[in-house]
């Protein structure tokens, strides 16, 4: 129906009447103003109006619009994904698992005729071709294990020098494939059920995953961040998992890292909120291949605070960058040999009513031209161990690699 994208310093509006508008992003016209201008073009009424809004993503690279971070820019023929892309869909299917019901929604301008019957027939039509999924060749990475350990050692050195207290360094992997990547998404959500399950088909590329972490959620005038900081391997053996969880809970390094990132979340919310508090602290959450240490920070938006600005002021998550955040991101740009793209950004919903729900883009595949990109990282502090940090990346990728194997058998 309509979309807004931010790419190479330009805001692009595509409107329902087919028109296209472009405007440069400047200090006088920042990203939040562009998003608010676009949202202001639409007003929706009706019983299910709260579900209507923008669905899409903000890439990690979008930080260039919010802070002084020298993100490597590129214009590649094989990669036309914008830094931010949010779409207003005319039709939505809302699943209510509590009531076991499905609602088909349609947004209509005054005077427009409904096409709900046509859409419903298309949904019920099962006459489509199904394709298998098959991985081709071996998984590769721009970084070898040793090169990633060199980066980890450099991160530790920056912590020891006092440049940062923590820095999150990641490693990207690539896997060629043929067939239907939706089967891979089905496998992933089966292996690693998470609070955020998503599959976005943007035409030339797809982003899909099973993220455990809330980047920012706004309901009414209340904002929430759920920082995950602290990870250990899950074995499937209840006794061993209990020992691993206890080790994670008691480990001084993991606890120091967690406290630091909870404080960073509090600071991020405090830029636009008052009554900022910790709702729960160091809760163990179990996933298919890892155990996470999780807290929740919340606050009430100030009277003059705008939801979009509050969201942007939390970006990117401290758990995917480090602390102090700006210096950590500058070092990430120097140390990592590639743009992060979608990884470490966020994906989700921006409501027309001011609500917002964004997941951090982790445990996620980006699929384009028969290649899967996936990535994971870990928080590096002065007391980090390079072998442990290397293994943490492998642990976090466990569900994704297992999903590739399962998808081939579906």
What residues fall within each predicted segment?
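Extended alpha-helical targeting/anchoring segments
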Residues: 1-410
């Amino acid at each position: 129906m309509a979309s807004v994208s931010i790419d190479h310093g330009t805001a692009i509006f595509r409107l329902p009447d087919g028109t296209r508008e472009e405007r440069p992003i400047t200090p006088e016209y920042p990203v939040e103003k562009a998003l608010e201008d676009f949202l202001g073009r639409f007003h929706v009424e009706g019983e299910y109006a709260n579900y209507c809004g923008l669905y899409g993503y903000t890439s990690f690279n979008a930080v260039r619009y919010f802070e002084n971070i020298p993100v490597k820019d590129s214009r590649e023929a094989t990669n036309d994904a914008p830094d931010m892309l949010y779409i207003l869909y005319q039709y939505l299917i809302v699943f209510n698992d509590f009531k076991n019901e499905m609602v088909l929604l349609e947004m209509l301008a005054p005077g427009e005729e409904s096409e709900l019957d046509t859409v419903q027939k298309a949904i019920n039509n099962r006459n489509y071709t199904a394709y298998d999924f098959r991985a081709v060749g071996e998984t590769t990475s721009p970084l070898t294990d040793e090169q990633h350990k060199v980066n980890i050692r450099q991160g530790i050195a920056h912590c020891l020098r006092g440049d940062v207290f923590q820095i999150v360094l990641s490693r990207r992997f690539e896997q060629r494939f043929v067939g239907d990547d939706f089967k891979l998404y089905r496998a992933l959500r089966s292996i690693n059920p998470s609070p955020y399950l998503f599959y976005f088909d943007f035409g030339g590329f797809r982003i899909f995953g099973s993220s455990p972490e809330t980047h920012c959620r706004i309901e009414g005038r209340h904002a929430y961040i759920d920082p995950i900081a602290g990870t250990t391997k899950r074995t499937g053996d209840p006794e061993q998992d209990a020992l691993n969880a206890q080790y994670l809970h008691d480990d001084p390094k993991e606890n120091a890292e967690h406290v630091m990132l909870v404080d960073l979340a509090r600071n991020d919310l405090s830029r636009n909120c008052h009554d900022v508090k910790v709702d729960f602290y160091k809760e163990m959450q179990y996933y298919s291949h890892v155990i996470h240490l999780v807290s929740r920070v919340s606050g009430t938006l100030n009277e003059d605070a705008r939801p979009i600005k509050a969201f942007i002021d939390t970006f990117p998550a401290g758990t995917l960058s480090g602390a102090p955040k700006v210096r950590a991101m500058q070092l990430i740009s120097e140390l990592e040999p590639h743009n992060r793209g979608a990884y470490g950004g966020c994906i989700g919903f921006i409501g027309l009513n001011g609500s917002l729900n964004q997941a951090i883009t982790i445990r996620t595949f980006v699929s384009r031209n028969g290649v899967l990109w996936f990535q994971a990282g870990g928080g590096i502090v002065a007391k980090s161990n390079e072998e442990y940090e290397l293994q943490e990346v492998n642990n976090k990728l466990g569900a994704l690699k297992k999903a590739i194997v399962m998808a081939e058998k579906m």
